[in-house]
Amino acid sequence: MGYHNVKYGKKAQRRNYSKTIYDVDLPNLIEIQNQSFDWFLKHGIKELLQDFCPIESYNGDLKIHFDDYFLTPPKYSIEETKIKDISYVAQLFVKTTLENVLTGETKQSNILLTELPLMTSTGTFIINGTERVVVSQIVRSASVYFAGNFDIKLNRTIYSGQVIPSRGAWIEYEEGSKEILYAKLDRSKKIPLSNFIYALGFDSKEAIENVFGKSAILDSVFDKETDMDSDNALVELYSKIRQGEKVPVDTARDFIRTRLFDQKKYDLAKVGRYKFNKKLDVLTRAENTYLACDFVNPENQEIMIAQDELLTKEKIAILKQNRHFLLQEIFDAKHNLENETDEEILAYKKYPQKNELFTKTNIINSRTGEVLVAKDTLVNDDIINHLRHNIHTLDEKVSKFFLGTKDIYQKEADRQGVFNEILEVYTSKDESGKLYNKVKLIGNDQRETKKHITLSDVIASINYYLNLYENVGTVDDIDHLGNRRLRLIGELLKNQFRIGLTRAEKNIKDMISTSKFGEVNGPGDLVNFTFLMSVIKTFFTNSRLSQFMDQINPLAELTQKRRVSALGIGGINRDRAGIEVRDVHNSHYGRLCPIETPEGPSIGLITSLSTYAKVNKYGFIQTPFFKVLQQDGKTTLSRDIDYLTADQEKEEIIASAGFVLDANNSFQDKKIIARSNGETGIFERNQITYADVSPKQIVSVATSSIPFLEHNDASRALMGANMQRQAVPLLIPESPIVGTGVEYRAAKDSGCLIIARESGFVTYVDAQKIIITKKPNQTVSLNGKTLYDTTQEFTYTQAKVLYENNHKEYQAEYTLINFAKSNQDTLVLQKPIVVLGEHINEGDILVSGPSTSQGELALGRNVTVAFMTWEGYNYEDAIIMSEELVKHDVYTSIHIDKYEVQTRELKKGSGQEEITREVPNVGADAIKNLDERGIIIPGSEVKEGDILVGKITPQGNIEPSPSEKLIQIVIGEKAREYKDSSLRVPFGEGGIVQSVHYFSRKNGDVLPAGVNENIRVFIAKKRKINEGDKMAGRHGNKGVISRILPKEDLPYMADGTPIDIMLNPLGVPSRMNIGQILEIHLGMAAKKLGIKVATPVFDGVNDYDLKEIMKEANLEPDGKMVLYDGRTGEPYDSRISVGVMYMVKLSHMVDDKLHARNVGPYTLVTQQPMGGKVQNGGQRFGEMEVWALYAYGAAHTLQEILTVKSDDIVGRNKTYSAIVQGTQLPKPSIPESFRVFIKELQSLGLYVELIKTDTKENEVNKSLIDYKKEGYN
């Protein structure tokens, strides 16, 4: 038997045809969103505040410290924020201390940092009442990158390098003309690489060669004509960065040091340090080279690796364990560019063994010359306080050194030399066995944990670059996922916070520098975080990564939360992105879906995470693999799972899913299809180190829901995955007969269903709420009577007793969503799928929502399909449908539209707008469905033009006198002073009023300035499927309904069953999506057997299984049958493929698009008709359409279209009058666009004449209307 029955949740069961004997559950599909936001709340904010703490005044008198932070609970619930159109936020407060440095006094207060939008449990944010999703961004990781391009002229490869931080100045290496190597700092002009090396602290060519070793490539770097040293090189480097500006060497050194080695200006982040240490590790380059000298343990003189030995992986492992012996000091602390110079250091260690610092010189009062602190005085807290009290009289150097942000003892501890790991190797061996090409390899200090770049890193990167010319080291593939990482919501928010806090920091510094401690009540008077609030608000409302949630169905919702975009701030520009960055890369395997991406300009730049993908702490995407063990000559699959990044995967040989195992989990085949370093091949089973966990780990959730995916062309699979996300929720959802097994998890994790938070019994259920009573963890009594004893088994009877006695602490209440409007104007309705007394486990699905059935994804309906033509109506992929599907609401959907009206306070003296039933100049019939306030009654049926809310606006701005007011009240002559500004149903709309929301300033509702009342009317419309609606299958087979036939005209089977849908058979072979044919055969068999089937992607029903199930269902082996013409009753000549296909109705509906105009608005300048359905516009008659009329010689029609039907203002009014009066149509006048053209020429200073042929007059400035002729005075 090639299948097994599997239960999905409690309600759904399928016959699963998966061949894999192991089944790894999918991880929570939206956990990356929730986990990242939680990290930001717990750690991200804390790290940021530490980076900005303390903020010090310019004179050093006052400091502001951020001690801690806390969030207040949100003011409104999620439901309330949606109704009131406000954001779901919590106030973020920071505990702030203002310190008087001179006296040590402090003042504390809690200050509002910002209103922080909170993530809901489903991974969304609610901003201004609408749900939004922040998608993850994929960017190039901070690291050191090298690239090589073959130069045809030079007949060799030229290399370039980039040292890229997360934030800060880039260092770039490149080869210029005449084979000279150059360096650039911070995108400045380039300088010779030799000068850049000098600037790092080397004083002579000999010093450089002593570190880097002698080599031909290094010799070519030096400019032999000039004498260069460290100081001159620093000044030159500064000059290149600052566009030729010349400064003293101390200023240049200080500037370069700040640019590269200051944490505030240069940030690698954790990921940058990890990647730097990985790339610049000397041992990575040394593998497969020959050691140039003995590797000796200096402690016992033991030779650990002999000279000339090949450095294999085993030898490299020995070096790794003893890598501290490779460290050499390049610069001591005194000459390290990262440290202050001798002139800047004003304290020294008198006794090396003691941690005590003494002043180098006398510290004097710069105003009076008085000695404040004598030379050789021990620096302690008293001395520092004494200097603080005299801060205004100190020299700038003194105050910077002793009273800077860093403690001087900490500075001394941090002042270290530059250490690098150095190894000399031979790279080549000739035929005689002689080694040659000696190369010096320099790696960075692997102990380094600093978040900024170090001199050790820079030296190692230069050496790596030079090594490339000696064939040591590797170039990087920037499109490899080992070099690209995800910025999740937590990191994106942290970056925005940094921008906001940086702007706020300057403002705070200015405030505290102009304030005195005694004059302020607390830090709240000095601190203003308006900049931060503005940045956060802008990010959530305007950023390309913060998107309006695609709420049309659960799959669309889930896919958007797992979406990965390369666009946005710090990402790729869509217009400049090449093919390489868009293309599928072998490192995407199991991490990014190679199928699901948009068609059009964003192709390849927006992708989706694969089903099992996770993101590690550095932002690199991981995918799981089973460990493979080699034991007793057998290759065994372990159940231990490792999550590997693309970099970690490089070294492994990974078996592709589909391998055959025996009962002991050992591989049966000697040769296994596997991947190594991205390439697929056949390997011996004893070489395998890992194995895929599932065949579907390659693709995304949307793609894995396509059955028989392996039989479809990739471009059609892409369309299938994308179109499923456009499926409209149907009135009666139905899960697919032929599924893939992911439908349950996709629906559960999407966020549109209610999941039980704990186990228990259902003690109350209706359409509004579900109550689950859970098992108490202690004995429960009431009035001496025991309601539940922990020794007893917990039953429904006991749960009911607890519920009836109102024990709320043991009850969990779940509120269902009823008739809500989604972001895409579709209906959101949740219905209970549990019954009273049912036992529920934690994690069970309690309700079915839009496009779900029994807890499974249900985007469409299972319909009987025949691949045949019918009178040419299914030409070009058109679809012919049965009228029965329309009658029985098979593809009917409900849509809800929102209409809004506000009453405003008008200008002074003009009064205010009013909501009223007394609408002027309308009959009683127009207001029959309005209540006494003038608002439509819910449940009323409305059509276009009907009044929804009666509103009147005063005309004129004259305030009536008291006597006039009295007359108006007595006579009631409102109609004369008020105009009708009621909210009406727009053109082409209508339906049933579902609900009305009324907000008023009087009721305490928060409304925009000047608005007194706000009324929202929701109209529900039932849309039956219609000709012109777009439908699709799951295989990219899309089409538009061309004809809906009555049941009696449709072809029928031998048993009289009519066909539901007819598809064009020509749409299959050229599109190469054969999956749809297999689906209809399997669907027909499963329907006859009364079962549902799961055929997982790459691991489902094969030819043998399909034949067996068709035999079981008594169907023909080829799936074809004789059909009879419904009109004549005669059989068709050929047997026809008939089966059951799952087809969805897409959101491209004809009701939204069909539109016609007779009269309507015109654009102001050109006076041509507006365009589009929203503006009630006309159809564009473009250049090519004009050519068509040329071709027919239809001169009068053409003239009419280009004049009176377009922008001839006078002509169209005269034509209208002529049609009404029945007179002859007049000649057209000059079109308005021609007048606009003339005005544009005149605006350029050109003299334009328009000479009338009969009168010879210049009519260029003549008025549009002949007043005399028209009868005007």
Swiss-Prot record:
Biological process annotations from GO: DNA-templated transcription
PROSITE patterns found in the cross-reference section: RNA_POL_BETA
Aminoacyl-tRNA synthetase is among the record's keywords: no
Keyword Transcription attributed: yes
GO molecular function: DNA binding; DNA-directed RNA polymerase activity; ribonucleoside binding
Entry protein name: DNA-directed RNA polymerase subunit beta
Function of the protein: DNA-dependent RNA polymerase catalyzes the transcription of DNA into RNA using the four ribonucleoside triphosphates as substrates.
SUPFAM superfamilies tied to this protein: beta and beta-prime subunits of DNA dependent RNA-polymerase
GO cellular component term of the entry, any: DNA-directed RNA polymerase complex
InterPro entries assigned to the protein according to its UniProt record, in alphabetical order: DNA-dir_RNA_pol_bsu_ext_1_sf (IPR042107), DNA-dir_RNA_pol_bsu_external_1 (IPR019462), DNA-dir_RNA_pol_su2 (IPR015712), DNA-dir_RNAP_su2_dom (IPR007120), DNA-dir_RNAP_su2_hyb_sf (IPR037033), RNA_pol_bsu_bac (IPR010243), RNA_pol_bsu_CS (IPR007121), RNA_pol_bsu_protrusion (IPR007644)
Taxonomy, superkingdom: Bacteria
EC identifiers of the protein: 2.7.7.6
Assembly information from the UniProt record: The RNAP catalytic core consists of 2 alpha, 1 beta, 1 beta' and 1 omega subunit. When a sigma factor is associated with the core the holoenzyme is formed, which can initiate transcription.
Classification of source organism: Bacteria, Bacillati, Mycoplasmatota, Mollicutes, Acholeplasmatales
Catalytic activity entry: RNA(n) + a ribonucleoside 5'-triphosphate = RNA(n+1) + diphosphate
Keyword tags: DNA-directed RNA polymerase, Nucleotidyltransferase, Transcription, Transferase
Family the UniProt entry places it in: Belongs to the RNA polymerase beta chain family.
Protein source organism: Aster yellows witches'-broom phytoplasma (strain AYWB)
